[in-house]
Amino acid sequence: MSDLYIGLMSGTSLDGVDGVVVDFSGAHLRVLAHVNAPLSTALTHELLALNSPGTNELHRAALAANALVRVYAHVVAQLLELADIEHSAVAAIGAHGQTVRHQPQSFDGTGYTLQLNNPALLAELTGMDVVADFRSRDVAAGGQGAPLVPAFHQSAFGQPDQTLAVLNLGGMSNLTVLGPCPATESPAGVLDADPPSCFHSHDVLGFDCGPGNALMDTWCLQHIGQPFDADGAWAAAGRVHGELLAALLDEPYFAQSAPKSTGRDLFNSGWLTWKLEKFSSVAPVDVQATLTELTASVCATCVKRYGSESSTLIVCGGGAFNSHLMVRLQALLPRLKVISSQARGLPPLQVEAAAFAWLARNTLLRKTSSLEKVTGASGARILGAIYPA
């Protein structure tokens, strides 16, 4: 079996599709190619709309899934060209899909998670094996189905002599806390292809903190016509409104204990509109500053509660490029060193895509990937369904 895998990720931020080719042949994984492909405005709007109940949803969701998969196939073609490899050299594609509903419950029969995808079509378009549907087995086992990347974070960033925290700032924010890993001998910046021998669920904690970029991006698009706040410059020009921040923080989800997960089912434009009802006089730029402070505050609180022994906070995802947000995180966490994942050998936009390449590999090798302490499932499970070429 080949040691080359492709990972494809389109997250709740809806800022495009990230794809990577990863080589797992050596002691340490290597990313051979990375592509970021934007989604069309029409597809982005439809995927956003499908996060909420509407008319003719089944038909629209099927068409949106097909459209997304055609973007996936285009990304795969670009990756093969950049890496200068044939499709036959790749063992499988790990394709996450687009989460449009995430309502996990524990063992009561009502929990579900839905990622729009058509892995059969992707296998047909690429001529490659596809692994998809990574989350549903964990939900079936009573887990949250999210986050799934902490296991990968341990293999990629775990260190032998220190506790680390990894913060993914996508549409939502999720935190991983990694305990020391004595069996690891990899120096900082070197990424392990396989988990070290100390890799157990008790070494890793992970959960969704709350909103990441989603609310900030929504507000930006609505008021300045931009899909995101570049470098956080707009937020930096405003002032945090204390009463509005308190109202935003008055959300039961933030007080819940881990394991927990969330998404646009909760933190969406409707939630923001509701919270802003009593603050119509606040200038849009100050709302943006306050939304940025919300993300920073929620994430910092989670780090203090669950990762107080951490020496470093490694930030990945699109939010790592928001300079103002990174400054606020460092200010709220003065005892930690806040750095981009780039400093540890993996650029921020490659981390989640690489994680799904890693998860696909585990599926083919029949290795478990979920961590019961992270998701709350009844045990570790092999994740994903295989669609042969």
From Swiss-Prot:
- Which InterPro entries does its entry note? Anhydro_N_Ac-Mur_kinase, ATPase_NBD
Highest taxon above the source species: Bacteria
UniProt keyword Nucleotide-binding, yes or no: yes
| Ranges in coiled-coil conformation | none
Does this UniProt record's set of keywords contain Kinase?
yes
Q: Which GO terms describe its biological process?
A: 1,6-anhydro-N-acetyl-beta-muramic acid catabolic process; amino sugar metabolic process; peptidoglycan turnover
Task: Look up the EC number in the record and give it.
Answer: 2.7.1.170
Q: Which UniProt keywords apply?
A: ATP-binding, Carbohydrate metabolism, Kinase, Nucleotide-binding, Transferase
Give, as one word, the top-level EC class.
Answer: transferase
Q: Which cysteines are joined by disulfide bonds?
A: none
GO MF: ATP binding; kinase activity; phosphotransferase activity, alcohol group as acceptor
Question: Pathway, per UniProt?
Answer: Amino-sugar metabolism; 1,6-anhydro-N-acetylmuramate degradation; Cell wall biogenesis; peptidoglycan recycling
Q: Which residues bind ATP?
A: 11-18
Role, per record: Catalyzes the specific phosphorylation of 1,6-anhydro-N-acetylmuramic acid (anhMurNAc) with the simultaneous cleavage of the 1,6-anhydro ring, generating MurNAc-6-P. Is required for the utilization of anhMurNAc either imported from the medium or derived from its own cell wall murein, and thus plays a role in cell wall recycling.
HAMAP family the record matches: AnhMurNAc_kinase (MF_01270)
Q: Which family does it belong to?
A: Belongs to the anhydro-N-acetylmuramic acid kinase family.
- Put simply, this protein is called Anhydro-N-acetylmuramic acid kinase
Organism field: Albidiferax ferrireducens (strain ATCC BAA-621 / DSM 15236 / T118) (Rhodoferax ferrireducens)
